[in-house]
Amino acid sequence: MSQEKNISELSFEEALKKLEEIVRRLESGDTTLEDSIQMYSQGDALKKQCEARLKAAQKKIEQISLDQDGRATGTSPFDAE
């Protein structure tokens, strides 16, 4: 099974944890150049996976619309911008 397939099967939390570990190892400076390049590549794939999971979750979020008295009147799609 390829690295890309493994990453795509990770939950957001698992991918984020792996990404944080890679960042920690890269920041420590205790890796070879080849290992650093490989970890950077894996980290980039993990970052993209996390972003994709967040965007998918954001599309599912709805905002509750309130009237002037504060009563719920319905929902509308979440707009982050």
From Swiss-Prot:
It comes from Zymomonas mobilis subsp. mobilis (strain ATCC 31821 / ZM4 / CP4). It is found in: Cytoplasm. This is Exodeoxyribonuclease 7 small subunit. Its main location: cytoplasm. Transmembrane segments: none annotated. The keyword Ion transport does not apply. The gene is xseB. Disulfide bonds: none annotated. GO terms for cellular component: cytosol; exodeoxyribonuclease VII complex. PANTHER family: EXODEOXYRIBONUCLEASE 7 SMALL SUBUNIT. Keywords: Cytoplasm, Exonuclease, Hydrolase, Nuclease.
